[in-house]
Amino acid sequence: TREEYTRFLLPDKALTRRFYPISIEEPDEELTLSILSGSIPSIEYETKVKNTFSANTTERILRTLISISIPANQPDDQPAKRPELPLTLLEMAFSYAALSGKTALSCEYIEQAVHHSNRLRKEIRTNFTCAL
């Protein structure tokens, strides 16, 4: 982060010659959706769990994960930018399915991922349902 660069690297001349700050804007919702969609095949490969939802249902699920991941729904001390939190929730859902010995992703595991995430406020976690 810029804060870490200023705090740790900038005071050290040798490090400032080797590291340069690069500013990257947070992706918008559409780009985040594209990133998440593009990540599914590698998550499937790693977990051996398949996404068997239709393309439309998958898009609705991903948009839901993106929408609940807004900063207002996160604890004040742990803000995350897109696509970090929705991607983490997606990976957790696949992992819960894999740990349960399942080969297909279901709403149950998406709900588990959200309910067990400490990166969302309690009221978001407890009220979340994967309504398709």
Name each model-derived stretch:
Residues 1-132:
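AAA+ P-loop NTPase nucleotide-binding core of proteostasis motors
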